[in-house]
From Swiss-Prot:
It catalyses: apo-[malonate decarboxylase ACP] + 2'-(5''-triphospho-alpha-D-ribosyl)-3'-dephospho-CoA = holo-[malonate decarboxylase ACP] + diphosphate. Pfam families: MdcG, MdcG_N. Its EC number is 2.7.7.66. The keyword Transferase applies. The lineage of its organism: Bacteria, Pseudomonadati, Pseudomonadota, Gammaproteobacteria, Pseudomonadales. Belongs to the MdcG family. InterPro entries: Holo-ACP_synthase (IPR017557), MdcG_C (IPR049180), MdcG_N (IPR048903). Transfers 2'-(5-triphosphoribosyl)-3'-dephosphocoenzyme-A to the apo-[acyl-carrier-protein] of the malonate decarboxylase to yield holo-[acyl-carrier-protein]. This is Phosphoribosyl-dephospho-CoA transferase. NCBIfam families: malonate_mdcG, PRK01293.1. The active site is at D131, D133. It comes from Pseudomonas fluorescens (strain Pf0-1). The keyword tRNA processing does not apply.
């Protein structure tokens, strides 16, 4: 692959043979069925990418590593913004409701979580009580007031909406950045740390 996979990207091509020897049967079955894996934030050796395998149930998640040479297909969250589903679940209603706001917000956005997984793969992952997980590519600062305005829009949705701001230094939850705390949790492949500015994370907790 020319481009390095990013967190939340979906990758096809991993086989059960790449799983740890003690991998549960559900993980073997998931890969054998042709399901994609999702890129996670973790350090990996050269030639590998840290991924997560999904099972049918929420508690079925397995951390693993995929060979970069095995990647047959990659789908990013932003490639799923306009994808529809025949299943008229609350989470899809929320996505349709918020699309105009997100399209006009000025940043690149994408769909992740169970919704992104099902829209990209066709494998059932959404249910009646699913949250809508989104990402926003924010290479430059989004002000806290801008974050609060987005949260206000999301509060009108029919289901819970969780959005992660993707900064050059890691990810921070939109709701946290829209809050009043002086420092927020920034997550990247190396660590999770408290910072006052996710776009200039010089102040970190020990």
């Amino acid at each position: 692959m020319v481009n390095t996979p990013l967190a939340h990207d979906l990758l096809w091509g991993m086989t059960p043979a790449q799983l740890p020897a003690d991998a549960p049967q559900w993980a073997i079955d998931s890969l054998a069925a042709g399901q994609p894996v999702v890129v996670r934030r973790a350090l990996s050796e050269d030639g590998c990418v840290a991924v997560g395998v999904r099972g049918r149930f929420r508690e079925q998640r397995l951390a693993a590593f995929m060979s970069v040479d095995s990647i047959a297909c990659r789908v990013s969250p932003e490639a799923l913004c306009q994808v529809e589903s025949a299943r008229d679940l609350p989470v899809m209603q929320a996505l349709r409701q918020l699309r105009p706001v997100l399209d006009d917000c000025g940043w690149t956005w994408g769909v992740s979580g169970s919704v992104g997984f099902e829209l990209a793969s066709g494998f059932t992952a959404m249910h009646e009580r699913s949250d809508l997980d989104l990402i926003l590519r924010t290479p430059q600062l989004i002000t806290r007031n801008q974050a609060r305005k987005l949260v206000a829009y999301f509060e009108q949705a029919i289901c819970r909406v969780d959005l992660q701001l993707q900064t050059p230094f890691g990810a921070v939850a939109l709701r946290e950045w829209a809050g009043n705390a002086s420092r927020v949790l920034l997550k990247n492949a190396r660590e999770a740390c408290l910072v006052s500015d996710p776009w200039n994370p010089q102040e970190q907790a020990a």
